[in-house]
Amino acid sequence: MDLYGVLKPLFRFMTPEQAHHLSIRVLKSGLVPDLSGGPDDPVLATRVWGLDFPNPVGLAAGFDKHCEVADALFRFGFGFVEAGTVTPRPQPGNPLPRLFRLDEDEAVINRFGFNSEGLAPFVFRLGQRRASGKHGIVGANVGKNKESEDALEDYGAGVSATCRLADYLVCNISSPNTPGLRALQARAEMETLLAHVISVRNASMPDPAARTPLLVKVAPDLDDAALADVAEASLATGVDGIIMGNTTLSRPASLQSKFKDETGGLSGKPLLALSTERLGALYRLVGGRLPIIGVGGIASGADAYAKVRAGASLVQIYSALVFHGPGLVTRIKTDLAARLKADGFASIADAVGVDVR
């Protein structure tokens, strides 16, 4: 039995948040075996933003909130890891309980509210990693403090502190658990924010060829008009990419769990159809001019392939790990490679957006 097989029964006797804390402790212990399956199939390699990804399957933000275990997570076979969301100043987030497993639905509801240790320890760990020459692409996902009255200042602080240490940056303006945050997705507000953080990044990194790519993370709940605003704001400001999407406030009628009506954002299997449809719509709007990371409901190679065909240059998973364990990463990669080859694609890039062009 593997380590996950040993721990899984223990997780069921813990609250979801306790199980998460135990997972972090195990990853920090150095006891995690290499589950990567060896070198990735060359068909999975892809180059985006000048970064060479060994495979397109990444870990979404929210697991390694404080940038504690990025290197251990690469032992699962991820092509990249996104740490955060980190806020400028420490904050506890929302009261417990704030994380719920919907086992019958293979879904999760969370209302964490950007619990964060703040930028100082996050940046220290990123800096340690950079100084040690560790390999592996690590992104930094930044947000705003709940009580902050100046979103521009908070996001600017996050970008300024992390841009020279992370491989890519993400401004998270789509969490449903910070009051008023999603209002930043409106066109005027989004253009103002993105113009500001891009200027902060550029001032910190004067050489255009060496600038860390900056992405924006948006919600799957955006209607067509709002999605068009996101596309136009992104193209107008020159942001480098978009993540579609975050958790959803919607509740599909199919949900069975007793936790289905808990307040917070829903992730996992029930989000797959919505997030993939919105991904395709966004890809059409940006016309392939901006790379998109597809997130939401991925639990198989088929799901990942659907995201790629809908317009994702890269994909991320998180909730599915709760139900299927870390071995899922290698299974997704193996199946994705087989599907690409079966359809005659020589690379991930060749398949991006083929269903929506």
From Swiss-Prot:
It is a peripheral membrane protein. One of its GO terms (cellular component) is cytoplasm. It holds the Pfam family DHO_dh. Pathway: Pyrimidine metabolism; UMP biosynthesis via de novo pathway; orotate from (S)-dihydroorotate (quinone route): step 1/1. GO terms for biological process: 'de novo' pyrimidine nucleobase biosynthetic process; 'de novo' UMP biosynthetic process. Its cofactor is FMN. The keyword Magnesium does not apply. GO terms for molecular function: dihydroorotate dehydrogenase (quinone) activity. Its main location: membrane. Keywords: Cell membrane, Flavoprotein, FMN, Membrane, Oxidoreductase, Pyrimidine biosynthesis. It catalyses: (S)-dihydroorotate + a quinone = orotate + a quinol. The active site is at S175. It is found in: Cell membrane. Binds 1 FMN per subunit. InterPro entries: Aldolase_TIM (IPR013785), DHO_dehydrogenase (IPR050074), Dihydroorotate_DH_2 (IPR005719), Dihydroorotate_DH_cat (IPR005720), Dihydroorotate_DH_CS (IPR001295). Belongs to the dihydroorotate dehydrogenase family. Type 2 subfamily. Catalyzes the conversion of dihydroorotate to orotate with quinone as electron acceptor. Monomer. This is Dihydroorotate dehydrogenase (quinone).
